[in-house]
Amino acid sequence: MNRLLIAGLVLLFCSCKKYIQKQEQNALEAVVTNGLWYVAGYEQNDSDITSSFSGYLFKFDANNTVTATGGNTTVTGQWSDNINARTVTADFAGAAAPLVYLNETWTITDSYTDSVSAKCVDTVNHTTNFLQLKKQ
């Protein structure tokens, strides 16, 4: 009887944990996919290259696509998140600079409903890059 009770409690706890994670996932998706975002800060190899992203706006969709529009340029990429690891991955396949600089797995360092700060270790140059996105 005790084993059955313990097994039931473990199952209940795991179910609740999955439910909470799903709710967190849904909340994140609602914030990210609602509105347009822009690069408010980007530091690469200790150099501020934020101005390279001037004029670009990003639209994240629930189907994990992201569209970057700047001037006459529109590029579609993919994005994904991992709530447990606090990471977001972006991939603009075949994109040129500056969008190619976003093709990383970013660790979220700070987040609000209208801004996100993140960092990543550049796997090519072995440096830490910093990104700040703000909602328009």
What does each model-identified segment do?
Residues 2-7:
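Sec-dependent signal peptide recognition
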